[in-house]
């Protein structure tokens, strides 16, 4: 029951968003919640790539090291050309939406809002964060969001404190990041979306092309053996064939309308022991003092030598 709460919440947010902007082109990071206990497979692949087949660049910025019980920013960058559009489920052109997933080490989590700085509050305005599940507060999801205004998504992260949690150790930790723009090519059910290039299942000749009332196209193809095959192309992709064209098996019948894609990367952060920092500072101070004393001693010796005429 606990695991259903964030899923239901995500579904509610999506439903409200659809009512506000029905023509949007969604990036669905929360779909993974409904199908996978863990969004990262044993191979290291984030499961969003199972539906978003195109590979695109995703970047991340995190501090090299952080102190215990401190708030820091993990920034996910989802670059693409401004004003890029793609097709929605009804075939119309719409702006790209973006989404992101950040898989933090155990103990790290979304920082409570009362610890956000004014800068973080400004940078996260309009962004809604959800946990992957009730049990996995270290896995955070964002999206869908309007892409042109959210090419950089800031995640406010709270680091754990080994002094209050004995399961946490100081050291280096991995962070797994995924960023998506646009709709996928495969639904979680395994069906293809209209955000695909469609190909001929067999070789033959196009005998007819009929437009459907919802924008789809029904293509009849006759093979050399006389078998007639029907290919239904949903609204959106542009047809590349016409009647009497001969096509080979696997030949494209449409253009590829997809302009989005998914990318992932791994980065690292060090949970730094403040005692080591204090020790390092003390060492630097000691070295600096030693150098100063050596310089003073050298000058003193030079004065004595000068006075003695050496």
Swiss-Prot record:
GO terms for biological process: photosynthesis. Its cofactor is heme. The chain crosses the membrane at residues 277-297. InterPro entries: Cyt-f_TM (IPR024058), Cyt_f (IPR002325), Cyt_f_lg_dom (IPR024094), Cyt_f_lg_dom_sf (IPR036826), Rudment_hybrid_motif (IPR011054). Coiled coil: none annotated. It is a single-pass membrane protein. PROSITE patterns: CYTF. Binds 1 heme group covalently. It is found in: Cellular thylakoid membrane. Residues 1-23 form the signal peptide. Heme binds at residues 28, 48, 51-52. GO terms for molecular function: electron transfer activity; heme binding; iron ion binding. Belongs to the cytochrome f family. The 4 large subunits of the cytochrome b6-f complex are cytochrome b6, subunit IV (17 kDa polypeptide, PetD), cytochrome f and the Rieske protein, while the 4 small subunits are PetG, PetL, PetM and PetN. The complex functions as a dimer. Component of the cytochrome b6-f complex, which mediates electron transfer between photosystem II (PSII) and photosystem I (PSI), cyclic electron flow around PSI, and state transitions. This is Cytochrome f. The lineage of its organism: Bacteria, Bacillati, Cyanobacteriota, Cyanophyceae, Synechococcales.
């Amino acid at each position: 029951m606990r695991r259903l709460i964030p899923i239901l919440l995500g579904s509610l947010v999506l439903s409200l968003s659809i009512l506000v902007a029905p023509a949007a082109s969604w990036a669905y990071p929360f779909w993974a919640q409904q199908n996978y206990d863990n969004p990262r497979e044993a191979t290291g692949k984030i499961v969003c790539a199972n539906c978003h087949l195109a590979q695109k660049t995703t970047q991340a910025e995190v501090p090299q090291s952080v102190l215990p019980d401190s708030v820091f920013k993990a920034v996910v960058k989802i670059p693409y050309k401004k004003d890029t559009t793609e097709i929605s489920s009804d075939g119309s052109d719409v702006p790209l939406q973006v989404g992101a997933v950040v898989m933090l080490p155990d103990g790290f989590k979304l920082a409570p809002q009362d610890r956000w700085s004014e800068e973080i509050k400004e940078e996260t305005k309009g962004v809604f964060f959800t946990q992957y599940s009730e049990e996995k507060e270290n896995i955070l999801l964002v999206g869908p969001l309007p892409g042109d205004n959210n090419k950089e998504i800031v995640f406010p992260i709270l680091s754990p404190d080994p002094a209050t949690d004995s399961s946490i150790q100081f050291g280096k930790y991995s962070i797994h990041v995924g960023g998506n723009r646009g709709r996928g090519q495969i639904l979680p059910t395994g069906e293809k979306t209209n955000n695909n290039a469609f190909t001929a299942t067999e070789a033959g000749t196009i005998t007819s092309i009929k437009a459907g009332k919802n924008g789809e196209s029904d293509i009849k193809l006759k093979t050399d053996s006389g078998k007639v095959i029907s290919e239904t192309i949903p609204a959106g992709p542009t047809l590349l064939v016409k009647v009497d064209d001969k096509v080979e098996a696997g030949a494209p019948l449409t253009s590829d309308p997809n302009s989005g894609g998914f990318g992932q990367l791994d980065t690292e952060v060090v949970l730094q022991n403040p005692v080591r920092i204090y020790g390092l500072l003390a060492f630097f101070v000691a070295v600096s003092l030693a150098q100063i004393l050596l310089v003073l001693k050298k000058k003193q010796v030079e004065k004595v030598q000068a006075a003695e005429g050496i």
